[in-house]
């Protein structure tokens, strides 16, 4: 993939801004704690906020690393650890845990249905986790206050594909918008949150298609305000 130079610079500038802001917040919060400006009973709350900011920053940097790895001739192992077993409910729970605290601030929950069935595929759990983290991040950012993000997974009988469906009420997007495109953010989303890299969902598509040989899609129903993401991964089995 060869990107227009001006567009690349704009993307990197925006990305850098998204990384620096949380780190500045972390440094400011730590200074306030160390200087004794934060009451002792408020320190745990502030530390959880710091952890959330650091998790966001790490996720952004991982997205950039995946973007470089899967769109260039960057000399990296593109399919490392792909012989591992990805237990889908376990990876979903791990990914969701990063956004539970952030979601609570707006009354948004993440719930996995039917977690008892251990559907699985062969692949790298860390890479699949990043896909789910990006989608949960999107859901928490643009979800409606007090809504629930529901996650279901099952194995389709005729194809053997594992299907992961993530649904929740949220700010929508138009059908003509390719929200998985590089640097693309829905018009309605930009009205709610001005900042954003436009990289997370693009990385989801790169990983699902290029690493797992699967498919990812999304749709929004304006009448019900329901946004759904569907991930299809071949080679499903029950662990």
Which stretches of residues belong to each language-model region?
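Detector for a conserved hydrophobic position within an alpha-helical segment of the HATPase_c
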Residues: 208-209
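Conserved catalytic submotifs in the C-terminal HATPase_c
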Residues: 109-119
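Conserved micro-motifs of the catalytic ATP-binding
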Residues: 72-81, 120-123
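Short alpha-helical Gxxx[C/S/T] motif in the catalytic ATP-binding
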Residues: 200, 204
